[in-house]
Structures are given as C-alpha cells and as structure tokens.
C-alpha cells in the first residue's frame, strides 16, 4: 500500500474544499432564498461533487448519488460508542439517534485511515438496487484490486454479546459463585479496530441498526494490532431488527464479515478475494445465514502476514470460549484457491452449536475441521455441537474431515466430486432435500428458504440470471468454474 499516495490524495481534496452552503453577506446572496448551513462534519469542493466527511455525523444526513464522499479518519454516526452507566443512557442514545441515509449508486471512498462506525442507537440506511448498488472503496485508485487500502464499515448495536465462559460486560453474579447473563445490565463491550472504536452491546436482541442492501465494500481491512482489526463489514452486537441482504465484501485484508455477538440474520452475500476468513462468528452470536458465495483470490499463492484464509470460522475456545455461540447456515458455496494451501474450508472450533445445511466445499486441503473447546479451567474440554445436513466437499489431500467428524450427519455428508458453472452453481442436478430445518431461535422468527439443492445458486441457473448478477463488482466471480486448487502442503 502506497501511504504517500493516499495522504497526497486526501491533501489535494482538502485543499480544494469549500462549504457546501454559505452564510455570506455579499450582494450575491441578497435575496430571500434560504441557504442551507453546511454540517460541521462535511466539507465539499467548489463544484460540490466531492465531499470529505470527518468526525461525528451528529444529525440526520443523506449521501446523494451525484456526490463522491470521502471518509477521512474515524467517522462516527452518532455518539453511541461512549460508555453507558445507566439504563437512561441507553434510552437517551435511542431517542437522540441519527440516521445516515445513502442513496442508490452512491460512491463512498475511504482514505488510508477512513472507517465508518454506526454507533449504538443510530442507523445506517444504505439501500442500493441491483442496477445501482452502493459502493465503499479506496480513495487510492479507481479499480478494486487493492487490499487493505482503507478501514472498513463497523456497525455497533444494542444486542447481546457474551464474554468468555459466563463472564463479561453483560454478566452479573449468580448463585454458588457462578455468573449469569443479566438481562437488565448496562453493557459496554470494548470493540476491536483500534482507538476510537469505543463500546457496543446491550440487552435488546431486536435492536435495529438500519439496512444494508445491494452494498459493495472493497479493498478495506485496517490492522490496529495483533488480533485487532477492522474487517470489511464488522457486526458488533447488531440486532435482528437490522436488515443485511445482497452485500459483497471484496479484497479485504482481514475477514470478509465478522459477527461479535448479536442476533442479526444475513442473506445473499458474496465474499471474494478476502485474505483471512470470510464468515467469522464468535462471542455469543446467535443468528442465521443463507445464500453465500465465498471465492478466494485465484491470483494469490500466499496470504498476508499471519492470515489463515478459511471460508467459515466459528470460535469458542480458550480465551474465546463462549458456549452461547450458535449459528445456522444454509446454501453456502466455499471455493478455495492456491492461497488456501494448508487450510480448511470450515473450522468449527470450541464450545459452540453449529448447524450447516445444503453446502458445498471445494479447493481446500481439508473441507471441515471440528475442534472441541479447551476452556482453560478445571472444567477441561467441552465438546462442540456440530450438525451437517447435505454438506459435500471436494478437498485434498486430507479429504473431508480433519480432527473429528460432526456430531450429527443427515442426508449426504462427505467427499463428493464437485464441478461448478460460471453462475457459481453446481453442475450436478442432484436433489438434496432437508426434512427438518432448524434456524437459530433468536427472536426474529427467521425461516430458511426451503431449497432442494446444495450451494448458493440453484443448478441450471444461467450466470446472467443468478441472484448475484448485475450488482457485484465486475469480474469478481469470473473464472470461478475453473479455479485452481491449492498445492498439497497440508500441515496442522
């Protein structure tokens, strides 16, 4: 990443900025036409077609498609990431909440340190369309082939987050020297992503942080320190009142999407070229995910730094031991590449409950690794609870499982030769029925779409007719049918 180039770009933008509105007393303004006051967080160039956003968005604001917006530094929506000390603070944050609306087709760029944080009690209404998706990308250049060129998007909500082994910000003392989740507690969980990210979490499972629909997030991934990163899309305690549907995360330096607790359900996601995990959930996430395409970068042979490029990672072990974690996933297609040498399509780790339906894993050296939880206490090891229903894989040299098999296998589970079409659908038209779907009961009433096929796209679908067609980044799924497998260098 060329930092000098990026800082220069911001400097050039800043040098040409003037207020979008004016309160000048010159003769040119001597009429009765009202002049809008420029928000304190916004400065625009003379033409008004590029605006830099800084600091805190402290009032309702709409980003329009005729303007390019630049996120300079940590940009907060509202002030809900400060520490709450009483229930009245939560109520006030909700009452005073602001909404950032982004119009379809809007171009939002991030400077090197640009991060958008939607804080507790506030909303992001980013509703693009298939023909006019909303795009977050780097200010550095006009293409989408960078990696880690800006921060990313963080949403912080008031839904529950669970700490290690029955501890944490939302827990209280229970009977017999135990701790219990306190539904009345005021929770302040420190978020990942560096200084200024602040706090998230609460006791409102149905919390609503807005809508992300037909949104693309590209070239992000700020590293703040060891195990402390901004993902493409980071979901911290986000409630199931939030809608996330038709979202792409492309070329992120860290994870594509990571859930820290919360209850938000996610559907129709495309995760391409991300350097670490693509779907990562932990700290008591309770939610459902359906229809996801994961495609690792076909042009890379090694990941950056210590990244482990897996398709799905669910964590609840050692310092991340959180047995409340529960995820149900359906119709996922995981496609590895040379960069996934020595990696697993899924790593389901620790004391968690996971159910995976109608899913295909191809081009990893092992399809599924299941690890039980080392708690770090006298309790010793707690088994994972993993159910696989119609989960097939084409992985080598270790084949389908590493460590141990799932606790429950239903339907067809195991090694099956897999070929894909340009639509990211399986070529085989085998019918895979699910007799009993069991979504996570997080209070949302979520129900899986009753599919009878494996993978994210129905076999026989033409690429032009796939649910991802027309809105994802051009070329990001090209060649998926012919993607090379990794070299056989597997080692635990």
Protein language model features and the residues they cover:
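Extracellular beta-rich repeat passengers
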Residues: 30, 34-97, 113-121, 128, ...
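Bacterial Sec-dependent N-terminal signal peptides
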Residues: 3, 10-47
């Amino acid at each position: 990443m060329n930092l000098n180039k990026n800082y220069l770009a911001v400097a050039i933008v800043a040098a040409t900025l003037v207020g979008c509105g004016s309160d000048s007393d010159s003769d040119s303004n001597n009429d009765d036409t009202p002049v809008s006051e420029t928000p304190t967080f916004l400065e625009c160039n003379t033409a008004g077609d590029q605006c830099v956003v800084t600091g805190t968005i402290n009032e309702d604001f709409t980003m329009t498609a005729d303007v390019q917006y630049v996120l300079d530094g940590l940009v907060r929506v509202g002030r809900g990431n400060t520490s709450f000390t009483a229930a009245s603070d939560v109520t006030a944050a909700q009452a005073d909440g602001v909404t950032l609306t982004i119009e379809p087709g809007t171009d939002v760029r991030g400077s090197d340190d640009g991060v958008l944080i939607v804080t507790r009690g506030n909303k992001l209404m980013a509703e693009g369309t298939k023909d006019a998706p909303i795009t977050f990308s780097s200010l550095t250049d006009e293409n989408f082939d960078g990696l880690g060129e800006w921060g990313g998007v963080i949403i912080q909500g008031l839904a529950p987050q669970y700490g290690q082994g029955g501890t944490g910000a939302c827990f209280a003392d229970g009977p017999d020297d135990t701790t219990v989740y306190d539904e009345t507690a005021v929770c302040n969980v420190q978020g990942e992503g560096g200084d200024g990210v602040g706090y998230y979490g609460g006791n409102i499972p149905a919390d609503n942080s807005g809508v992300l629909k037909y949104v693309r997030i590209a070239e992000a991934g700020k590293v703040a320190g060891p195990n402390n990163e901004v993902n493409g899309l980071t979901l911290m305690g986000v409630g199931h009142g939030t809608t996330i549907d038709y979202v792409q995360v492309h070329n992120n330096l860290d994870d594509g999407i990571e859930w820290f607790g919360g209850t938000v359900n996610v559907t129709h996601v495309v995760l391409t070229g991300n350097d670490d995990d693509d779907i990562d959930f932990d700290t008591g996430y309770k939610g459902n995910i359906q229809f996801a395409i994961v495609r690792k970068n076909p042009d890379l042979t090694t990941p950056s730094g210590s990244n482990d490029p897996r398709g799905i990672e669910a964590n609840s072990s050692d310092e991340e031991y959180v047995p409340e974690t529960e995820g149900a996933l359906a119709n996922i297609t995981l496609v590895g590449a040379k960069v996934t040498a020595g990696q697993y399509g899924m790593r389901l780790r620790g004391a968690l409950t996971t159910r995976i339906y109608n899913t295909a894993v191809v081009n990893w050296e092992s399809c599924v690794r299941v690890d039980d939880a080392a708690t770090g206490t006298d309790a010793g090891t707690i088994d994972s609870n993993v159910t696989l229903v119609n989960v097939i894989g084409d992985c080598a040299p270790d084949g389908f499982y590493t460590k141990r098999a799932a606790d429950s296998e239903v339907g067809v589970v195991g090694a099956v030769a897999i070929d894909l079409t340009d639509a990211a659908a399986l070529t085989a038209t085998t019918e895979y029925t699910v007799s009993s779907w069991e979504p996570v009961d997080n209070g949302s009433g979520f129900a899986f779409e009753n599919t009878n096929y494996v993978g994210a796209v129905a076999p026989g679908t033409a690429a032009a007719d796939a649910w991802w067609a027309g809105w994802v980044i051009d070329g990001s799924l090209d060649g998926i049918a012919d993607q090379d497998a990794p070299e056989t260098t597997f080692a635990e």
